[in-house]
Amino acid sequence: MDRGPQDRPGLLRTWGPLAAVLAALAAVAVLVLAGDGTGTGSAGGATATTALPPGEGLPEEVLPFSVAEERGVADEIDWGPTCDPTTGVLRLPLSPAPQCFAPFTGDNGGASATGVTGDAIRVVVYLPQRNDPILSFIYRQIGNTDTPDKVFATYQGFNEILDRYYETYGRTVELVPYEATGNISDPVAAAADAETIARDLQPFAVVGGPLLTEAFSDTLAANRVLCISCGPGQPTSWYEERAPYVWDIAKNPQQNLMLVAEYVVKRLGGRPAVYGGEGVRGRERRLGYVYLSSTPQTEQLRRGFEAQLEEGGVELAETASYEDPVAIAARAGEIMARFRDAGITTVLYTGDPLAPQALTRAATEQGFFPEWVITGSSLVDTTIFGRTYDEQQWRRAFGPSNLFARVSPEVAGSGYLYRWWHGEPPPAQQSALILPNLQLLYAVLQGAGTELSPEQFRRTIFAADIVRGSVIAP
């Protein structure tokens, strides 16, 4: 594989391994436009089993390597130095490797949407408020020293790499920083920030956003501005109502809870607790549920989760919600006492990675040692946060996870890619969601062609084949 222009064997700094672990949050779906261009659905009366000509539905100027092979023209194309023509994938140390697209020549038609000219695609990078009290509290738990400046510099570094390798049809992605005016849970500031971005910066897209309020993504959608990873996860219907503007990287909470419900029904319900402590182990499981209520849709998600459990013959004996991951310490004792008195053997948890600190400490103080079911909530299943929970409690934790097998950051991952190209670690060592956000953006730009718009962005995603993952790249 070709090496970057400043290849040196420098090591990642102290928290480099975290970047590789946190990349699991992304669960990046690598988009490869190929085949019939309609996914597994139907179009124009054709069924999913109807054989269509190779590349049917693709814009004329968009030619993936696999389609060129099917058409028998791959050998006639000069794929350029960034493509490995023996495999049809880009010469990038990414897994799975992105497919090559034929180099574009000619006129791209100029402006095609707000923020899109003949030369550039304007993309705003949302940066958190400096010294955001909530983020500062979270960062202190894991020694994170990232600043907005470091985060934006890392975005720029990855953007340089992807701009070199992906086909964007004569346009360059232009990143514009925007620093938030409020903390990540402030809906008023979030809505005002979104209005300012839409009115004054007029971008094609925004990447990033406040993760504890939907006001930012909701306001951007109302202003017809596309955004990626710009707010907390929502039910599927929420995204559909705001289509084609709001996109996320990971599966949404509704999809995650469906997975958790299936796991609980098939593996836990009606069976004895085997990982609990004294007074719990051996008893038939009695479930309690603790969850973060951060959006108006949270209760809708909870009701759907309970309904799916009940369909499988499993009931939640107790539930408890919280809204503030920092203030949960004041309620943790009451929640755990209620669960203990209700005879709960098994605690299901969906929320932020901080609350289990207070919950597990409170449980131990009360001599209550239930099972803890990991549900794939962001970062809760990572070692770096797990080490901050009460050890006597977390030794009893198990359940489904979104994480993949660990790989040394010296041989793979976002930090490795950055170092491979720039010869030094990324400025923001712990901002592993940066690369997936840009990967999604560039993958869609490459498949969308010259007529770029939010609607074409959506069509491109839904026309893409699903690329199977692996134990190191789910």
What are these regions (language model features)?
Residues 150-156, 163-242, 249, 323-330, ...:
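Beta-alpha junction/loop-to-helix N-cap segments that form part of ligand/metal-binding clefts
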Residues 421-431, 442-474:
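Segments of small-molecule ligand-sensing domains
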Residues 145-153, 184, 188, 210, ...:
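Soluble non-cytosolic domains of exported or imported proteins
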